[in-house]
Amino acid sequence: MFGSNDYFEPRVRNPFGYLLPDTGMRHTNVPRLPWPDLRDSFAAAGWANLTNRRDTVKVGDLTFAFAGVDDPHLGYDRLDEVAGPADGNADVRLGVAHAPYLRVLDQFAEDGYDAVLAGHTHGGQVCVPGVGALTTNCDLEPARAKGLHRHPANSHPGDPASSWLHVSAGIGTSPYARIRVACRPEATLLTLVSQAP
């Protein structure tokens, strides 16, 4: 699935506006990028398109069940199209979203996904050493702007309607605001291990 930076060209903006309260304005009046060509090229290479869709992928003897939504930050997510219990026959069940909005995380946890993978926050992009992220650019609290957490935040493994949440700080910045403070770019390697018997 895609995020806003796959759909629209970057443009000059006040980089500190990111720290202000969200006005709901999404700056979609800039030229669109050729994302359909990107999608088609990915699909031709075997990509599982999770844009408001579910899919199943076999890796060796394991079955992975996925559900994904289009960018919640733009309001493109269609949770009703992927809602419902995760595939109980799958070995691993993963929800995927560009932006970790609570409505999406809540739905995936309620539906029984083992983990939800997201990005969008850039780890807060501007962090204070010893404090952490100041904002997430979504409704997720700054303490979970990057890394591995539980969702809901106060849940424990095995709790009903709960899952793991991994938010990647990612490697991206805007070409017009190459700023990251106390928040290094990152690429994440997650290692999945089996549950204790």
Where are the language model's segments positioned?
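Core catalytic region of metal-dependent phosphoesterases/phosphodiesterases
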Residues: 1-58
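Divalent metal-coordination and catalytic microenvironments
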Residues: 3, 49, 66, 98, ...
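Catalytic metal-binding/acid-base residues of hydrolase active sites
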Residues: 4-7, 54-55, 70-72, 100-101, ...
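Short, hinge-like loop/turn segments at secondary-structure boundaries
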Residues: 16-19, 68, 84-85, 134-136
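Beta-strand-turn-beta hairpins that frame and shape the catalytic cleft
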Residues: 47-48, 54-66, 88-92, 151-165, ...
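N-terminal post-signal-peptidase region of extra-cytosolic proteins
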Residues: 51, 76-82, 138-140
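Catalytic-adjacent loop/helix segments of enzymes that bind and process anionic phosphate/sulfate esters
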Residues: 66-97
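Conserved beta-sheet core of the metallophosphoesterase superfamily
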Residues: 100-188, 196
